[in-house]
């Protein structure tokens, strides 16, 4: 690593005993830091941090060394800004927080406009670059809460003095709590990239991280896999592929190729590891249009659970230019536990993706778009053997019967089990489902699908479903409180599930239907919610039920 500083102006320190660092200077190469590493003979990746301290700054160089046989994915090349400025910011939450590599879920502070007052739109965020590397695309990461970008203009410049910005495009990130990706028509050696944010959730502007990338067009692993498999999802073997070609793959993919070739891929594992994921509508956009609370965007469960630190391989087929990501959902709360409405998000690109899980939970595919677009097509994704644990889920449209539900529930091992109906999803404690409804779910899911449908009909919004909007309500089973409704979720305390999942119990006591319908009514009441009527106007829906 070269530097323009003299040897005496900087120092280096590290603790790992499997690498060596030396400060050197030669006539040909000038002053530089040489890093050499020993062979990794272990079975897992190892990481070391090298601290370089100078009179002007301190830098940390992270060295990752993979084990023999470990899957090495050549990702795209991250381009880090050299600086930046924003038109306004809350103290301690300036633009530097958006390119420090730290997310709010890790305890870091995001960028945020001043609290307690509306942002002075348009809010500008400007990023500086050396201009020596092409930038092909960028990813805007949101935080959970106010400030998610709505409408935004993106400008670039290649001038050394960062003048004469050129408009690259106008976008609508729809104020959603999900990453947004902007791809340029061609790579730009930008010296500056400027965002002009015209609107934001709650009249604020925030940004967790802003990442910039050069596309890596020389992905050796992708090319190697396509000598054996028919496409990058690795679900079918090409005709006339030899065993020698298969054995030449990394060990991880040898096992996959052999399972596909020999038809030994476990049927249950395969059902959830290889799936086509449907597009769903944008919840923020339709909540605004239909005057409702936000439905859930967790419409696409994978049925796969993970633990913190797991390395997960995700093979993504043609995305048709759509942006998709993976979200890991676990729990929140101190007084009592309940399912979180959002979690760590990992962007997905076509091809081989390798994700390191920050925390435990179940994985959901985030695929939200305009349903009327001709590119809103199902996307094939393969989460191969060895990546996470299959827990499964029950889908009414796909699995159809109580017998299949009972089979899937008994095979599941995670704390929570997901049931997807037409209009509502249950994400409930597995042990409570085994206690109350171990063998039958159809009566419950049909009942609550109907109740949601009746409320939508009463609102007069059933005509746009599912052609334009198709998100589900998402019911969870908190370990405290009673019943409630909010954006993204409705909650029914886990000790009460028997009263809403067993049709006889629902019909036996008025409150067993009225109470949940009252909470679902909170989701739909905005158009009739007069002042001081929050706990009564929604009863129009529960009385209708």
Model-identified regions with their sequence ranges:
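Extracellular beta-rich ligand/substrate-recognition surface
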Residues: 104-123, 170-176, 286-295
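A short beta-strand micro-motif common to beta-rich folds, especially ectodomain repeats
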Residues: 44-55
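Extended extracellular/luminal ectodomain segments enriched in beta-structured repeat modules
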Residues: 120-122, 130-137, 189-190, 306-312
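Trp- and acidic/polar-enriched beta-sheet ligand-binding modules for extracellular glycan
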Residues: 121-122, 144-217
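Catalytic cores of extracellular degradative/oxidative enzymes
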Residues: 405-411, 415-545
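Disordered, acidic Ser/Thr/Pro-rich linker "stalks" and the adjacent N-terminal cap
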Residues: 69-130, 143-148, 216-224
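Surface-exposed binding patches on compact interaction domains or structured appendages
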Residues: 3-34
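Beta-strand-enriched, solvent-exposed domains that form extended recognition/catalytic surfaces
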Residues: 228-392
């Amino acid at each position: 690593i070269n530097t323009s500083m003299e040897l005496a102006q900087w120092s280096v320190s590290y603790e790992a005993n499997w690498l060596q660092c030396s400060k050197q200077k030669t006539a040909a190469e000038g002053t530089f830091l040489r890093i050499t590493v020993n062979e990794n003979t272990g079975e897992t990746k190892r990481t070391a941090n090298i601290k370089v301290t100078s009179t002007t700054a301190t830098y940390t160089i992270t060295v990752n060394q993979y084990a023999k046989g470990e899957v090495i994915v050549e990702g795209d090349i991250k381009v880090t800004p050299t600086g930046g400025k924003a038109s306004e910011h809350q103290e301690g939450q300036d633009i530097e927080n958006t390119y420090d590599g730290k997310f709010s879920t890790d305890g870091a502070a995001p960028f945020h406009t001043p609290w307690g007052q509306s942002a002075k739109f348009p809010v500008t965020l400007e990023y500086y670059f050396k201009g020596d590397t092409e930038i092909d695309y960028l990813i805007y990461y949101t935080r959970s809460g106010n400030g998610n970008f709505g409408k935004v203009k993106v400008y670039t410049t290649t001038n050394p003095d960062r003048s004469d910005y050129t408009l690259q495009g106008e976008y609508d990130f729809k104020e959603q709590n999900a990453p947004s990706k902007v791809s340029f028509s061609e790579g730009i050696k930008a010296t500056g990239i400027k965002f002009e944010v015209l609107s934001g959730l709650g009249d604020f502007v925030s940004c967790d991280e802003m990442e910039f990338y050069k596309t890596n067009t020389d992905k050796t692993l992708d090319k190697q896999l396509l000598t054996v498999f028919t496409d990058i999802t690795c679900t079918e073997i090409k005709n006339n592929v030899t065993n020698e070609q298969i054995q030449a793959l990394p060990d991880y993919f040898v096992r996959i190729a052999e399972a596909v070739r020999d038809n030994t891929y476990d049927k249950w594992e395969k059902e959830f590891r290889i799936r086509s994921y449907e597009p769903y509508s944008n919840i923020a956009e339709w909540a605004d249009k239909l005057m409702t609370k936000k439905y859930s965007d967790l419409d696409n469960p994978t049925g796969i659970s993970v633990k913190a630190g797991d390395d997960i391989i995700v093979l993504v087929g043609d995305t048709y230019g759509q942006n998709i990501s993976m979200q890991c959902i676990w729990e929140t709360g101190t007084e009592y536990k309940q399912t979180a409405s959002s979690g760590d998000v990992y962007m997905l690109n076509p091809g081989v993706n390798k994700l390191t899980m920050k925390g435990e939970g179940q994985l959901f595919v985030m695929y939200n778009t305009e349903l009327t677009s001709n590119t809103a097509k199902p996307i094939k994704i393969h989460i191969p053997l060895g990546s996470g644990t299959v827990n499964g889920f029950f889908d009414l449209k796909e699995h159809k019967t109580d017998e299949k539900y009972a089979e899937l529930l008994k095979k599941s091992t995670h704390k929570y089990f997901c049931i997807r109906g037409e209009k509502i999803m249950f994400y409930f404690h597995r042990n409570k489902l085994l206690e109350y409804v171990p063998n039958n779910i159809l009566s419950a899911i049909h009942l609550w699908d109907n109740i949601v449908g009746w409320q939508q009909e009463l609102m007069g919004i059933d005509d746009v479903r599912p052609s334009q909007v198709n998100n589900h309500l998402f019911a969870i089973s908190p370990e405290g409180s009673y019943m409630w409704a909010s954006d993204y979720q409705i909650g029914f305390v886990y000790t009460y599930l028997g009263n809403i999942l067993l049709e006889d119990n629902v019909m036996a006591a008025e409150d067993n239907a009225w109470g949940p319908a009252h909470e679902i009514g909170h989701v739909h009441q905005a158009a009739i919610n007069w002042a001081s009527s929050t706990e009564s106007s929604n009863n129009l829906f529960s009385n209708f039920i």
